[in-house]
UniProtKB/Swiss-Prot annotation:
The lineage of its organism: Bacteria, Bacillati, Actinomycetota, Actinomycetes, Micrococcales. Belongs to the bacterial ribosomal protein bL19 family. One of its GO terms (molecular function) is structural constituent of ribosome. Keywords: Ribonucleoprotein, Ribosomal protein. The gene is rplS. The keyword Ribosomal protein applies. GO terms for cellular component: cytosolic large ribosomal subunit. GO terms for biological process: translation. PANTHER family: LARGE RIBOSOMAL SUBUNIT PROTEIN BL19M, RIBOSOMAL PROTEIN L19. Gene3D superfamilies: 2.30.30.790. This is Large ribosomal subunit protein bL19.
Amino acid sequence: MHILDSLDAASLRSDVPEFRAGDNLKVHVNIIEGNRSRVQVFQGFVLGRQGDGVRETFTVRKVSFGVGVERTFPVHSPIIEKIEVVTRGDVRRAKLYYMRDLRGKAAKIKEKRDNAPTKK
């Protein structure tokens, strides 16, 4: 089993920012079309994270033209160029599956406020 653990450790990415459910993310995904490749940005909020290590995934949800779109990404996948945290969400759950049924203002997530001291 130690050999598998060392292979898993070699596949882990080090540039993954800290994020959790409720955070608004921009996921830059490498899309390959024929012989061309381009970067597509998928921006939405995190419904939840699952798994651990190399097998860890996260689900991002956004509403595009009135239709909810969810996409699940492996955290350590090579097709992800980078992950940007846009805002931090103030939620009390690890999985936000109930957000699928909410519409309008009810589907808004409060932004987490920083408790950093202000400079005078």
